[in-house]
């Protein structure tokens, strides 16, 4: 999965929940591992730091644009 800054990703939901959309704002390196800072499209005030390997899991996230 090619992740770049300002990409929009969506959680894959197997239940009847609406999927959430996130925007990648920046990439960080922590202890030699690359992490992405993502924000919810509807709430850009809160940020989450997620390991890049989690975002590359095609069972959890997919790239929208």
Predicted regions and their residues:
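A generic structural motif
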Residues: 26-31, 42
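Short aromatic-glycine-enriched beta-strand elements
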Residues: 32-37
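Short beta-strand-centered aromatic/proline hotspots
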Residues: 18-28
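Short coil-to-beta transition motif at edge beta-strands of beta-rich domains
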Residues: 1-17
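Intrinsically disordered, low-complexity, charged/polar segments
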Residues: 41-65
């Amino acid at each position: 999965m090619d992740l770049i800054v300002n990409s929009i990703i969506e959680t894959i939901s197997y239940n009847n929940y609406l999927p959430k959309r996130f925007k990648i704002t920046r990439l960080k390196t922590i202890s030699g591992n690359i992490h992405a800072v993502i924000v919810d499209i509807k709430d850009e005030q809160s940020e989450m730091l997620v390991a890049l390997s989690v975002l590359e899991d095609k069972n959890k996230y997919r790239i929208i644009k």
